């Protein structure tokens, strides 16, 4: 008997489609609720600069402290769940790229040149360091005008390239990705079931080369890849490794 522990594993395509559809609906509901909550908490002044400042540097608001603790604990257990299910800005960037997909009827998500992408994903760590250094040196990080201009810019970039801000700029994502590297539950590929169609990669908003190596630090646990895999080759599990081709 297979003693490995699986949380999500599919052998029946019909069952898989049904379950993944429900998971995607649940994710949309979660994103929407957390977005509405963020609007209420901030008095409808949703600032991308303020969000970064509060999350990275911190404040004394209990709700922020609890959210940060939950996000970090979740990252250590299951990866960047906060990014894919709870982040209010992730919700907005998700909306704009899905809007482009529907408007232009895209079957494959737009991608950044691979060489550029592989370098740009480290830029968010530079932003994280700069935010911390700015705080330590007493530089004030504020200004709603700047915040909304940046949000508008990243919404446009997110319309062109899915989750641009989340991939390359967000210091919150870079902080959580450090914990996600050691997450207990991981997205895994069974190479014996994979037929190399790369449907999963075409649907991945983070441009992860799933069939080559799943980067757990970049994965936001949106499970779009699992939703389109017709062979059930992907699983989200603990205490197992990728299954190599026999």
From Swiss-Prot:
* Residue numbers binding [4Fe-4S] cluster 1: 194, 197, 200, 229
Q: Is the keyword Repeat assigned to this protein?
A: yes
GO MF entry, a single one: 4 iron, 4 sulfur cluster binding
Instruction: Give the principal location in a single coarse category.
Output: membrane
Provide the topology term for how it sits in the membrane.
Answer: Multi-pass membrane protein
GO (cellular component) term, any one: plasma membrane
Localization recorded for this chain is: Cell membrane
Q: Which residues bind [4Fe-4S] cluster 2?
A: 204, 219, 222, 225
Q: Where are the transmembrane segments?
A: 32-52, 69-89, 121-141, 146-166
The reply to whether Iron-sulfur figures as a keyword in the UniProt entry is yes
Q: Sorted alphabetically, which keywords does the UniProt record give?
A: 4Fe-4S, Cell membrane, Electron transport, Iron, Iron-sulfur, Membrane, Metal-binding, Repeat, Transmembrane, Transmembrane helix, Transport
Cross-referenced InterPro entries, in alphabetical order? 4Fe4S_Fe-S-bd (IPR017896), 4Fe4S_Fe_S_CS (IPR017900), Electron_Trans/Redox (IPR051684)
**Can you give the residue ranges of the 4Fe-4S ferredoxin-type domain?**
185-213, 210-239
**What PANTHER family would the database entry show?**
FERREDOXIN-TYPE PROTEIN NAPH
Identification of the protein by name: Uncharacterized protein MJ0749
